[in-house]
Amino acid sequence: YIFSNGLRMQGKFMRDCVDAGLDFFRFSIIGYNAETYSKWMSSPNFERVIDNMKQMRSYATDCRIASYHLILDTDNLEYEKEQYLKLSEGGLVEIWKMHNWSGVYEIGVNERKGEVKTCGRPFSPDVVIRAGGLDGNTGAVAPCCQVLGRDEEAVLGHTSKNTIEEIWEGEEYTKLREDHTTGNYPDYCRSCDFLLDDPEVLVYTNHERDLMKMHGTEFDLNDYR
């Protein structure tokens, strides 16, 4: 599985990835035209990425190619959904409501609504590991992918210093699970909209994407909430 903005997925590099046995690639395309893409992705490469996606779909056989999109304005949801579907041209697609990346971004009118409860991630049988780390360490273990941008607050350990088992059973991870049990969430979780129980957050999908299952996993996060 590879999730990427897809900028480099072209030519020989793309073909080499597919030929090596890649079975799933997801293009992250936030914005349904060049203007909105430039605003949200901070990139002028909208047309290039769309062309890369088309080329990859025409070349790949066993590799499943999908695109991932976020609704920019919930008051304009149906229009944006249709624009994203046009971009996907019948390919695999998933369209989600906007999220705030653990409270880092103020999303205004797109703010999610719902009951606050644990997202389940501190209890689920997966571990998020970064390439880098703090203070010269590597393999930083994070609570989930949503804390991207708040890594200094949210590092639970480093695989360069300890085993995954030691980190999983260690003080920081144990404290995080306790906080999610009591509802006394740490700062890097407290404002995250993944704590909100919003069943309509997945706006549209035409493949086996499940709201409460992460790609490449079999467990259901509802079992850990």
Residue positions per predicted region:
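Radical SAM/AdoMet-radical enzyme domain recognition
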Residues: 1-79, 93-96
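A short acidic, often aromatic-flanked loop/helix-cap motif at beta-alpha or helix-coil junctions
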Residues: 73-75, 98-105, 163-166
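Short aromatic-enriched loop/helix-cap "lid" or pocket-rim segments at secondary-structure transitions
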Residues: 13-14, 39, 77-81, 105-108, ...
